[in-house]
A protein has these predicted regions:
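Soluble "head" domains of membrane/secretory-pathway proteins
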Residues: 2-40, 51, 55-61, 68-215
Length: 215
């Protein structure tokens, strides 16, 4: 073992920390250390928040009345942005999307909220008896008629592999695919999964049962 001369040993001792009593952890150092920890925590929280909103989930305020009475203007929903990318969309999903070029958009580009009616590859027709998917009549218990009837001008669509047909539940007061055509799935922000405000209407949002006639 190689030793150091006494004076060299004292010099090394002082360079690499020395006696803790000789270098006390002052209140100023504690304060600086605490501020650094707080800044790191805030930075990580901000990054996590933006990553969460960008890729996983995002709150959304319902602005339009086209989904009455399922959703009222002013209600808040949580939008799942991740699972649709993994599993795709299902009939009855309530989706939030940015209007494609063929749709009108507001000056502030407010997203739309609608219900998925037609899925990629399907033939959807509407008429006096309602909506038909590949010839099978769709039972829609959520449709709000606002005291009127649901007489539709006959139309039909054959959806491409990346298209969705979306309607509002308030059929007499909804600007949707009936007027502007299908939307590409790429414009969809995500699927509404929870209504969290107002508290007395808090609920999970799940696709309605359509029975066995329509897959």
């Amino acid at each position: 073992m190689v030793g150091l001369p006494p004076d060299m040993g004292q010099t090394a001792h002082s360079l690499f920390g020395g006696d803790p009593a000789a270098h006390p952890y002052t209140p100023q150092m504690r304060k600086r250390h605490l501020l650094i920890e707080i800044a790191q925590t805030v930075a990580l929280t901000v990054v996590a928040f933006y990553l969460l909103q960008a890729f996983i989930a995002q709150p959304f305020r319902v602005e339009q009345g086209s989904m009455r009475v399922t959703f009222e203007p002013g209600e808040y929903v949580l939008v799942d942005k991740l699972s649709p990318r993994l599993t795709g969309f299902h009939r009855g999903d309530v989706v939030i999307f940015h209007p494609p070029e063929s749709w009108p958009s507001s000056s502030d580009n407010t997203p739309y909220i609608k219900r998925v009616i037609g899925l990629p590859g399907e033939t959807v027709a509407i008429g006096a008896d309602g909506v038909r998917i590949n010839g099978a009549l769709l039972t829609e218990g959520y449709v709000y008629l606002d005291g009127g009837d649901n007489v539709e001008e006959p139309q039909s669509w054959r959806l491409a592999a990346d298209e969705l047909l979306v309607f509002g539940d308030h059929r007499s007061n909804s600007s949707d695919s009936r007027a502007y055509g299908p939307i590409p799935a790429s414009v969809v922000v995500g699927r509404a999964v929870i209504r969290y405000y107002p508290l007395d209407r808090m609920s999970l949002i799940t696709p309605p049962p359509y029975g066995t006639a329509v897959p």
